[in-house]
UniProtKB/Swiss-Prot annotation:
This is Protein phosphatase eya. Mg(2+) binds at residues 499, 501, 730. Residues 385-401, 472-486 have a biased composition (Polar residues). Residues 89-110 have a biased composition (Gly residues). Residues 22-131, 200-223, 365-419, 437-489 are annotated as: Disordered. Residues 45-76, 365-384 have a biased composition (Low complexity). GO terms for molecular function: DNA-binding transcription factor binding; metal ion binding; non-membrane spanning protein tyrosine phosphatase activity; phosphoprotein phosphatase activity; protein tyrosine phosphatase activity; protein tyrosine phosphatase activity, metal-dependent; transcription coactivator activity. Its cofactor is Mg(2+). The active site is at residues 499, 501. It comes from Drosophila melanogaster. Belongs to the HAD-like hydrolase superfamily. EYA family.
Length: 766
């Protein structure tokens, strides 16, 4: 039974509402930054508290009004929880709906609270009453005049939103447009979801002005006059601010579920507000720091404002223990981590950097489809790109928008029409297209007509991640082409590191006779073929690659001495008369090369660099036309030797070449050769065995001096740790080095191993 008492509707009810839901505990002492502003705004509320002693009756009257307003405005059920401050929490319900065929009525129950948030919670947050009123007032296409259902004036509500001591409240703006009519099952124009889901302003012509811009109202002018949704709580409403035709709404099932979440415990939350508005321990505010990055990407925030938003959200909202940002976030809110409510400050302060480094190993291929498991980073920082992994653009790796890792702080949206994370205010199709086209780093902005534009860097990073140092060692970074990960070139997804002898080609076992013994071949004939090929290899190395001059000063990579090259034109340079091999220190052996590589000073090193540059030019010029380099006479002999080797080895090189060709045809994979042979004869082998078209000379390394493991470290330094490395070889040395680097190893010991590798590549397992 409800007793209706006479009440003066001209007087504001701010004081009653505040006193009605006031916690019955000892209030902590809070220091406000501006006491005059608080006293000025809540002066009426203090007078009303002294004049109205009937608290319980007005309490029941207010509850009945809220229930009636909730039932009548079933088309736009927006029931918001109050601010997280346990010091002085007020209850406000903002109801804004596009009623009728063209009009939008913005109503709200204003609130005033003499108690505000603690000092660290002072940045502006809009209240329910003020923003519900302003949303109806500034709604585009509003056919009816603004109706303020609260007895507080619009000026009072709007000025209260500016106060430093205002309670934190979420809100819902439902801008009724000419196309938004009353739908079925409680769905009308405007996003009808829980207010915690949609922190989005739909007014496109004017925004709520404030002196200190909150993350929800950052730079409305940057989006052509539209207020881009900031998605402070990780979810978006998929509404389109500039779409003049219709307003995108979520499904009625989501709205019904959202209403049921609150309605089922309406009385419980209402009467026990002082316990419930300090969130229960099974809700987690774990993802609140990540909302700053989401807001920055959505509203195109500059780094200064982004840092302010991150600093605002993390200490004042998450670290203070007020982690009810996900109280009504989604039906899946119960699946969040447990027990972090009482230790919110401990988690955010002590373990704030736990997710900062990318401390997972991208090298271990645990399954054939392991590339998909690295599609989303498991441990990422708040300002880093969530989708920075190179597998996002692979054609065979699908990108699922709603798929997150088990430890991902981003909630899973229950509706396919709602955006994920930074891709708010964009339709699902446009979000997927932007994600796939820009490598997962697109920033969805609300353009005219809802067209999503992407903002990305060539490496797939966001603008704020530009220029950061890579968290990787650089053991032997030496030259221009063998440098770290360049910002202008996206690193490959997979790097296949091949061994040369007995993996890609059969050569040493032919010379030793072990291949003939294993496969019961003619020992003498195979050795004869092998010796002929060996002679051709060393002739090419001596004639064209200066092997007789640089044998004792062999390098690991073709560009290791390029820093000593002054770029002199070598077209008319005479290498035979430059005195390179005669400038030897007194008393030194004839072909001594010191460990540092310095033999005859700067001039000698420059001449050595000239030779390696000439080797590089010859390789690049004749890699696809070796017969021209050999000459007509040697060309026929070379083709004959290759044909005989193919017959003797049962087309071993042909099978390996198929695997190499399949990898080289992929846009995001690269073949790298690491051989124990010296660099000059290794280049001759590559050309003579027909592999020059596959391997660029920059992708060939010699492990003759430094070993395979050091070569692998240099390769990782060059391509970066985000790539996946697969080592393919036949010996124990390659396998040991691969295990030391945590690289998967594919052993090649027979023809069946090459066929299995080809099948794995063809099926997309590698």
């Amino acid at each position: 039974m409800v007793t209706l008492m006479p009440y003066n509707y001209a007087a504001p009810r701010c004081g009653l509402i505040d006193k009605m839901i006031e916690p019955k505990v000892k209030r902590p002492k809070t220091d406000h930054t501006d006491t005059h502003e608080r006293n000025r705004l809540c002066n009426l509320s203090q007078q009303q508290q002294q004049q109205q002693p009937q608290q319980q009756q007005t309490h029941q009257q207010q509850q009945q009004q809220q229930q009636q307003s909730h039932q009548q405005s079933h088309s736009s059920t927006v029931l918001a929880s109050n601010g997280p401050s346990s010091a002085g929490a007020g209850m406000g319900v903002g109801v804004g709906g596009g009623g009728g065929s063209g009009g939008g009525v913005g109503g709200g129950v204003g609130q005033c609270s003499p108690l505000g948030l603690p000092p660290q919670s002072q940045p502006l947050q809009p209240t329910i009453g003020s923003l519900a009123s302003l949303s109806g007032h500034y709604s585009n296409g509003n056919a009816n005049p603004n109706v303020n259902s609260s007895s507080c004036s619009l000026a009072t509500a709007s000025s209260f939103a500016q106060s430093a001591g205002s309670s934190f409240s979420t809100y819902q703006q439902a801008g009724g447009t000419s196309g938004g009519v009353s739908g079925e099952d409680g769905v009308v124009g405007g996003a009808t979801v829980m207010s915690h889901w949609t922190h989005d302003g739909t007014g496109s012509s004017a925004a709520v002005k404030s002196e200190s811009r909150s993350p929800g109202q950052v730079h409305a002018s940057l989006d052509n006059g539209s207020v881009a949704g900031s998605n402070l709580y990780g979810c978006s409403s998929a509404s389109n601010p500039l779409d003049g035709g219709a307003v995108a709404v979520n499904s009625s099932a989501v709205a019904a579920a959202a209403a049921a979440v609150y309605d089922g415990k309406h009385d419980y939350y209402y009467y026990n507000s002082m316990q419930q508005y300090t969130p229960p321990p099974f809700y987690s505010g774990y993802g609140t720091p990540y909302a700053a990055a989401t807001a920055a990407r959505q509203a195109k925030m500059e780094p200064g404002a982004a840092a302010a938003a991150a600093a605002y959200l993390t200490p004042s909202y998450a670290a203070s223990g007020n982690n009810n940002s996900q109280l009504y976030s989604s039906p899946y809110a119960g699946y969040n981590n447990f027990g972090q409510q009482d230790y919110g400050g401990y988690y955010n302060e002590q373990y704030g950097n736990y997710y900062s480094p990318a401390n997972y190993s991208p090298y271990a291929v645990s399954s054939p489809s392991s590339s998909a498991s690295h599609g989303h980073g498991f441990h990422v920082a708040a300002s880093s790109n969530l989708s920075e992994s190179p597998t996002d653009t692979h054609s065979t790796t699908p990108v699922h928008q709603t798929t997150h890792s088990p430890h991902s702080p981003l909630p899973i949206s229950p509706s396919t029409g709602s955006g994920i994370g930074p891709l708010g205010n964009v339709s699902a199709a446009a979000a997927a297209a932007a994600l796939n086209s820009s490598g997962g780093s697109s920033v969805g902005t609300a353009g005219s007509g809802g067209v999503a534009t992407s903002k990305t860097t060539p490496t797939g990073k966001t603008g704020r991640a530009r220029g950061r140092r890579h968290q990787q060692p650089s053991p032997t970074r030496s030259t221009a082409s063998d440098t770290g990960n360049s910002e202008a070139v996206k690193p490959p997804e997979r790097v296949f590191v091949w061994d040369l002898d007995e993996t890609l080609i059969i050569f040493h076992t032919l010379l030793s006779g072990s291949y003939a013994n294993r496969y019961t071949k003619d020992h003498s004939s195979l050795m004869t073929i092998a010796f002929r090929m060996e002679e051709m290899v060393f002739n090419m190395a001596d004639t064209h690659f200066f092997f007789n001059e640089i044998e004792e000063c062999d390098q690991v990579h073709i560009d290791d001495v390029s820093s000593d090259d002054n770029g002199q034109d070598l077209s008319a340079y005479n290498f035979a008369t430059d005195g390179f091999h005669t400038n030897t220190p007194p008393g030194a052996p004839p072909n001594l090369c010191l460990p540092t590589g310095v033999r005859g000073g700067v001039d000698w090193m420059r001449k050595l660099a000239f030779r390696y540059r000439k080797i590089k030019d010859i390789y690049n010029s004749y890699r696809g036309n070796v017969g021209t380099l050999l000459g007509p006479g040697k060309r026929e002999a070379w083709l004959q030797i290759r044909s005989e080797i193919e017959v003797a080895t049962d087309n071993w090189a042909t099978l390996a070449l198929k695997c190499l060709s399949m990898i080289s045809q992929r846009e995001n994979c690269v073949n790298v050769l690491v051989t124990s042979t010296q660099l000059a004869p290794a280049l001759a082998k590559v050309l003579l065995f027909g592999l020059g078209g596959i391997f660029n000379i920059e992708n060939i390394y010699s492990a003759h001096k430094i070993g395979h493991e050091t070569c692998y470290e240099r390769i990782v330094t060059r391509f970066g740790r985000k790539s996946t490395y697969v080592v393919i070889g036949d010996g124990n040395e390659e396998e040991t080095a691969a295990k030391a680097m945590n690289f998967p190893f594919w052993r090649i010991s027979a023809h069946s191993d090459i066929r299995a590798l080809y099948t794995a590549l063809d099926m997309g397992f590698l």
